[in-house]
Amino acid sequence: MATSTNGIIDPPIDDLLSKVESKYALVIFASKRARQINDYYADLHEGSLFDNVGPLVDSSVDDKPLSVAMHEINEDRLVLKPIAAAE
């Protein structure tokens, strides 16, 4: 059975900030992933399973997509790789 997440207080923000360069990068990274998770659940209702990737950590449908994204980042299921600068 999936364990329930504790929202934004778990994982701690300090742990999350060690995974990215800045708070801004964390917000953008987590929000983009949360949108993908939200789209995945919307696709489930439409019967399409192959357009988006679902949660990579144990979660339930009741968990907020942003909380799930934060847990994925904290558990190193997602890694932010910077794009190489144009020369």
UniProtKB/Swiss-Prot annotation:
Tree of life domain: Bacteria
Quaternary structure and partners: The RNAP catalytic core consists of 2 alpha, 1 beta, 1 beta' and 1 omega subunit. When a sigma factor is associated with the core the holoenzyme is formed, which can initiate transcription.
GO MF annotation: an example: DNA binding
The name this protein goes by in its record: DNA-directed RNA polymerase subunit omega
Key words of the record: DNA-directed RNA polymerase, Nucleotidyltransferase, Transcription, Transferase
Nucleotide-binding among keywords: no
Top-tier EC class: transferase
Enzyme Commission (EC) number: 2.7.7.6
Job of this protein: Promotes RNA polymerase assembly. Latches the N- and C-terminal regions of the beta' subunit thereby facilitating its interaction with the beta and alpha subunits.
Family: Belongs to the RNA polymerase subunit omega family.
Organism: Leifsonia xyli subsp. xyli (strain CTCB07)
